[in-house]
Amino acid sequence: MLIILALGQMAVILSRSIDLSMASNLALSGMIVALTNAAFPWVPVPALMVLAAFCGLILGAFNGILVWLLGIPAIVVTLGTLTIFRGLIFVIAGGQWVNADAFTPSFVQLTRYEILGLPLLSWYAILVVIGFYLMMTRTPLGRAIYAIGVNPNASVYAGIDVGRTKFIAFCISGMLSGFCG
Protein backbone atom coordinates (compact mmCIF):
# COMPACT_ATOMS: atom_id res chain seq x y z
CA MET A 1 0.00 0.00 0.00
CA LEU A 2 3.01 2.28 0.33
CA ILE A 3 3.21 2.56 -3.44
CA ILE A 4 -0.31 4.00 -3.50
CA LEU A 5 0.69 6.59 -0.90
CA ALA A 6 3.80 7.38 -2.92
CA LEU A 7 1.70 8.01 -6.03
CA GLY A 8 -0.50 10.43 -4.11
CA GLN A 9 2.52 12.28 -2.81
CA MET A 10 4.01 12.24 -6.30
CA ALA A 11 1.01 14.14 -7.70
CA VAL A 12 1.41 16.82 -5.05
CA ILE A 13 5.20 17.05 -5.35
CA LEU A 14 4.99 17.32 -9.14
CA SER A 15 2.75 20.35 -8.63
CA ARG A 16 5.45 22.03 -6.50
CA SER A 17 3.77 21.37 -3.18
CA ILE A 18 4.04 18.90 -0.31
CA ASP A 19 1.47 16.96 1.69
CA LEU A 20 2.66 16.17 5.20
CA SER A 21 -0.79 15.09 6.35
CA MET A 22 -1.03 11.90 4.28
CA ALA A 23 -0.40 9.55 7.21
CA SER A 24 -2.96 11.34 9.36
CA ASN A 25 -5.43 11.30 6.47
CA LEU A 26 -4.86 7.55 6.15
CA ALA A 27 -5.35 7.04 9.88
CA LEU A 28 -8.50 9.17 10.11
CA SER A 29 -10.08 7.54 7.07
CA GLY A 30 -9.17 4.12 8.44
CA MET A 31 -10.64 4.97 11.84
CA ILE A 32 -13.90 6.16 10.27
CA VAL A 33 -14.17 2.96 8.23
CA ALA A 34 -13.27 0.76 11.21
CA LEU A 35 -15.89 2.38 13.41
CA THR A 36 -18.44 2.18 10.59
CA ASN A 37 -17.71 -1.53 10.18
CA ALA A 38 -18.06 -2.11 13.91
CA ALA A 39 -21.32 -0.14 14.16
CA PHE A 40 -22.90 -1.34 10.91
CA PRO A 41 -21.63 -4.87 10.20
CA TRP A 42 -24.09 -5.31 7.31
CA VAL A 43 -22.27 -2.72 5.15
CA PRO A 44 -20.29 -4.61 2.46
CA VAL A 45 -16.50 -4.27 2.32
CA PRO A 46 -16.46 -2.63 -1.16
CA ALA A 47 -18.76 0.10 0.19
CA LEU A 48 -16.36 0.61 3.10
CA MET A 49 -13.48 0.96 0.64
CA VAL A 50 -15.42 3.62 -1.27
CA LEU A 51 -16.19 5.35 2.04
CA ALA A 52 -12.48 5.37 2.92
CA ALA A 53 -11.52 6.89 -0.44
CA PHE A 54 -14.31 9.47 -0.13
CA CYS A 55 -13.23 10.46 3.39
CA GLY A 56 -9.67 10.86 2.15
CA LEU A 57 -10.91 12.90 -0.81
CA ILE A 58 -12.75 15.30 1.51
CA LEU A 59 -9.66 15.69 3.72
CA GLY A 60 -7.43 16.23 0.69
CA ALA A 61 -9.91 18.77 -0.70
CA PHE A 62 -9.74 20.64 2.61
CA ASN A 63 -5.96 20.90 2.22
CA GLY A 64 -6.34 21.91 -1.42
CA ILE A 65 -8.86 24.65 -0.64
CA LEU A 66 -6.59 26.16 2.00
CA VAL A 67 -3.62 26.12 -0.39
CA TRP A 68 -5.55 27.30 -3.46
CA LEU A 69 -8.09 29.83 -2.23
CA LEU A 70 -6.33 31.19 0.84
CA GLY A 71 -2.83 31.03 -0.63
CA ILE A 72 -1.30 29.50 2.49
CA PRO A 73 1.93 27.59 1.78
CA ALA A 74 1.30 23.85 1.46
CA ILE A 75 3.82 22.91 4.13
CA VAL A 76 2.06 25.12 6.69
CA VAL A 77 -1.41 23.87 5.73
CA THR A 78 -0.53 20.19 5.77
CA LEU A 79 1.47 20.46 8.99
CA GLY A 80 -1.58 22.02 10.62
CA THR A 81 -4.05 19.53 9.19
CA LEU A 82 -1.75 16.69 10.22
CA THR A 83 -2.32 17.74 13.83
CA ILE A 84 -6.03 18.41 13.30
CA PHE A 85 -6.62 15.01 11.72
CA ARG A 86 -4.72 13.25 14.53
CA GLY A 87 -6.82 15.12 17.09
CA LEU A 88 -10.01 14.12 15.29
CA ILE A 89 -8.95 10.47 15.45
CA PHE A 90 -8.55 10.77 19.20
CA VAL A 91 -11.94 12.49 19.57
CA ILE A 92 -13.81 10.06 17.30
CA ALA A 93 -12.36 7.01 19.03
CA GLY A 94 -12.92 8.50 22.46
CA GLY A 95 -9.27 7.92 23.28
CA GLN A 96 -9.75 4.15 23.01
CA TRP A 97 -8.19 1.56 20.72
CA VAL A 98 -10.45 -0.10 18.19
CA ASN A 99 -10.31 -3.86 18.71
CA ALA A 100 -10.21 -6.24 15.74
CA ASP A 101 -12.83 -8.37 17.51
CA ALA A 102 -15.41 -5.69 16.68
CA PHE A 103 -14.95 -6.09 12.91
CA THR A 104 -16.78 -8.42 10.57
CA PRO A 105 -14.84 -11.50 9.37
CA SER A 106 -14.98 -10.31 5.74
CA PHE A 107 -13.38 -7.01 6.76
CA VAL A 108 -10.58 -8.75 8.67
CA GLN A 109 -9.98 -11.33 5.92
CA LEU A 110 -9.56 -8.65 3.24
CA THR A 111 -5.81 -8.50 3.81
CA ARG A 112 -5.46 -12.29 3.71
CA TYR A 113 -7.36 -12.98 0.50
CA GLU A 114 -5.22 -14.05 -2.50
CA ILE A 115 -5.81 -14.13 -6.26
CA LEU A 116 -3.30 -16.01 -8.45
CA GLY A 117 -0.89 -16.20 -5.53
CA LEU A 118 -0.84 -12.44 -4.89
CA PRO A 119 -2.63 -10.76 -2.00
CA LEU A 120 -5.73 -8.80 -2.98
CA LEU A 121 -4.09 -5.60 -1.75
CA SER A 122 -1.29 -6.11 -4.28
CA TRP A 123 -3.85 -6.33 -7.07
CA TYR A 124 -5.39 -3.08 -5.85
CA ALA A 125 -1.95 -1.47 -5.92
CA ILE A 126 -1.30 -2.74 -9.46
CA LEU A 127 -4.63 -1.33 -10.67
CA VAL A 128 -3.98 2.03 -9.01
CA VAL A 129 -0.47 2.23 -10.51
CA ILE A 130 -1.83 1.52 -14.00
CA GLY A 131 -4.65 4.03 -13.56
CA PHE A 132 -2.29 6.68 -12.21
CA TYR A 133 0.15 6.11 -15.05
CA LEU A 134 -2.60 6.50 -17.63
CA MET A 135 -3.91 9.63 -15.91
CA MET A 136 -0.50 11.28 -15.73
CA THR A 137 0.58 10.43 -19.28
CA ARG A 138 -2.63 10.42 -21.29
CA THR A 139 -4.88 13.15 -19.86
CA PRO A 140 -4.76 16.95 -19.87
CA LEU A 141 -4.80 16.87 -16.06
CA GLY A 142 -1.62 14.79 -15.91
CA ARG A 143 0.14 17.09 -18.35
CA ALA A 144 -1.09 20.11 -16.37
CA ILE A 145 0.35 18.70 -13.14
CA TYR A 146 3.72 18.20 -14.83
CA ALA A 147 3.54 21.67 -16.42
CA ILE A 148 2.87 23.59 -13.21
CA GLY A 149 5.70 21.72 -11.54
CA VAL A 150 8.15 22.70 -14.25
CA ASN A 151 7.10 26.33 -14.66
CA PRO A 152 3.94 27.71 -13.04
CA ASN A 153 4.26 31.07 -14.82
CA ALA A 154 4.46 29.52 -18.27
CA SER A 155 1.56 27.24 -17.31
CA VAL A 156 -0.64 30.28 -16.75
CA TYR A 157 0.24 31.55 -20.23
CA ALA A 158 -0.62 28.10 -21.60
CA GLY A 159 -4.10 28.43 -20.09
CA ILE A 160 -3.64 26.12 -17.10
CA ASP A 161 -5.31 27.15 -13.85
CA VAL A 162 -2.41 26.54 -11.46
CA GLY A 163 -4.47 26.81 -8.27
CA ARG A 164 -7.19 24.47 -9.51
CA THR A 165 -4.62 21.94 -10.68
CA LYS A 166 -2.89 22.00 -7.27
CA PHE A 167 -6.31 21.56 -5.65
CA ILE A 168 -6.94 18.47 -7.78
CA ALA A 169 -3.47 17.13 -6.91
CA PHE A 170 -4.32 17.44 -3.20
CA CYS A 171 -7.66 15.71 -3.85
CA ILE A 172 -5.85 12.84 -5.58
CA SER A 173 -3.39 12.60 -2.71
CA GLY A 174 -6.19 12.59 -0.17
CA MET A 175 -8.26 10.03 -2.05
CA LEU A 176 -5.32 7.63 -2.36
CA SER A 177 -4.44 8.14 1.32
CA GLY A 178 -8.01 7.41 2.31
CA PHE A 179 -8.09 4.32 0.11
CA CYS A 180 -4.98 3.03 1.89
CA GLY A 181 -6.66 3.66 5.24
Placement of each model-derived feature along the sequence:
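Helix-loop-helix "hairpin" substructures at the membrane interface of multi-pass membrane proteins
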Residues: P44-A52, I58-N63, V67, I115-G181
